[in-house]
Amino acid sequence: MASQNMTNPSINPDIEDELFQKEVEAVKTWWSDSRWRQTKRPFTAEQIVSKRGYLPIDYASNTQAKKLWKILEHRFENRDASYTYGCLEPTMVTQMAKYLDTVYVSGWQSSSTASASDEPGPDLADYPYTTVPNKVGHLFMAQLFHDRKQRQERLSVPKEQRANLLNIDYLRPIVADADTGHGGLTAVMKLTKLFIEKGAAGIHIEDQAPGTKKCGHMAGKVLVPIQEHINRLVAIRAQADIMGSDLLAIARTDAEAATLLSTNIDPRDHAFILGSTNSTLKPLNDLMIAAEATGKSGAELQRIEDEWLAKANLSSFDDAVAAAIDAGSFSDKAGIKQEYTSRAKGKSNFEARAVARQLLGRDIFFDWDAPRTREGYFRLKGGCDCAVNRAIAYAPYCDAIWMESKLPDFAQAEQFAQGVHAVWPEKKLAYNLSPSFNWKTAMPRDEQETYIRRLAKLGYCWQFITLAGLHTTALISDQFAKAYSTVGMRAYGELVQEPEMDQKVDVVKHQKWSGATYVDELQKMVTGGISSTAAMGAGVTEDQFK
């Protein structure tokens, strides 16, 4: 008979219920911590525990998540920032650890350099969904290894000498790109599970539609309704709770530059949906279907669409109401606009139409179906206001919020921060210091130097250059390959080895950096202290660098 224990419990329902209630109380105690003071969970501790198995597993992700939260709490409270960049591989993560307190793993970089299918491509999230978790695991295993290696090295030195040795924190928390979640809610949960198992401290997820996902700095972005993205955030938190992890969830919105919306089902989106205000036009898709039936294609179809859009006078309903008031003979136009705005704010389009009808005495023509795309998407009035509207809705379900933007626009970043903090004053913000921006034309160098600090004062406590790993690798690779092709080994000496030695970069002794000494010590431990095949024994060429 199997033993009666936690991993193979008694079939006695009383014992089963007792174990269940103890675990439920433990979860409730966990959730009462100040860490969760801003977090809304639309599920119960009982529901979470009932989804767990009997074998408790302590994930390293939880330790790293607690560490990340502590970093961001401190930075936010002091209006400071943790800033980092996208890491490509283990060499890079060990060098970043010396100077930066977090690490970023980019979906864009993974798509181009580390797809699980080995097929590179642009940032469309069309790679296997194991891709970014695998890169997290790759880097986290390297972090663990170099942490072990350093500890062994330090403990091999007399105590009185250790104070002069570097003691690098290699275990910098990793934040990774979850794209749109790669599918429905169960896909989001499985992806979250993978990230936790691989060692991620936090993940971010964006409010684009999965089938049309684009890099944040590409055109053609389609947003999902607000509630659909909230459901994704809830799915992340639920999966992390099931696994007992404090994993941070960062909500990204692409609303600033998005032009399309998958559906108008959520009334919180209604104020930003564009409609035709020209009652004489047929619906756009009817025209496009008729044109295709006559053999038109390509540029001809684009011309038909462009001409229709020019005539449609696309507008949000609120702007259409304002235009109708301006065109009318009302004595107090400003007062009517103000009353409409105060009464219609946050209302559905149906309710806003009723307010407008009451104030203007008539219905306003506004058709948001007429301009829909051939895929069925609604036209959207994106921008900072749209992003703030979404961020406020996401705030109770995430740990930080990021608005993707077209430019490094400080005034816009300030507007977004003020909009969010007017409702959620403690909400942490994240910012993409993107290499897609032309920093030279965006601002002078002295402003570039202070940009991170200025953003931090607004509450952007975590900032990152998504693709700096890619670009720095490309730059040195181009420089070295070009020089090597003309001056041979002089290029390696001048561009690589001598600067490594001058700047005391540990990788100059690449055998030691790779852990050869550590592995020798493992081997000696097993063989009683003697090994004739030690990698770092007499004859190792690295002695030239003493």
From Swiss-Prot:
Q: Which cofactor does it need?
A: Mg(2+)
* Alphabetical UniProt keywords: Glyoxylate bypass, Glyoxysome, Lyase, Magnesium, Metal-binding, Peroxisome, Tricarboxylic acid cycle
Record text on subunit structure and interactions: Homotetramer.
Cellular localisation:
Glyoxysome
Q: Which residues form a coiled coil?
A: none
Designated name of the protein = Isocitrate lyase
Q: Name one GO biological process term.
A: tricarboxylic acid cycle
Asked whether the keyword Metal-binding is assigned, the reply is: yes
Q: What is its EC number?
A: 4.1.3.1, 4.1.3.30
Q: What does this protein do?
A: Catalyzes the formation of succinate and glyoxylate from isocitrate, a key step of the glyoxylate cycle, which operates as an anaplerotic route for replenishing the tricarboxylic acid cycle. Required for growth on ethanol or acetate, but dispensable when fermentable carbon sources are available. Also acts on 2-methylisocitrate.
Q: Which domain of life is it from?
A: Eukaryota
Residues forming the catalytic site = C215
**In which family does this protein belong, per the annotation?**
Belongs to the isocitrate lyase/PEP mutase superfamily. Isocitrate lyase family.
**Positions of substrate binding:** S106, G107, W108, G216, H217, R252, N432, L433, S434, P435, S436, T466
What SUPFAM superfamilies does the record point to?
Phosphoenolpyruvate/pyruvate domain
Q: Which Gene Ontology terms cover its molecular function?
A: isocitrate lyase activity; metal ion binding; methylisocitrate lyase activity
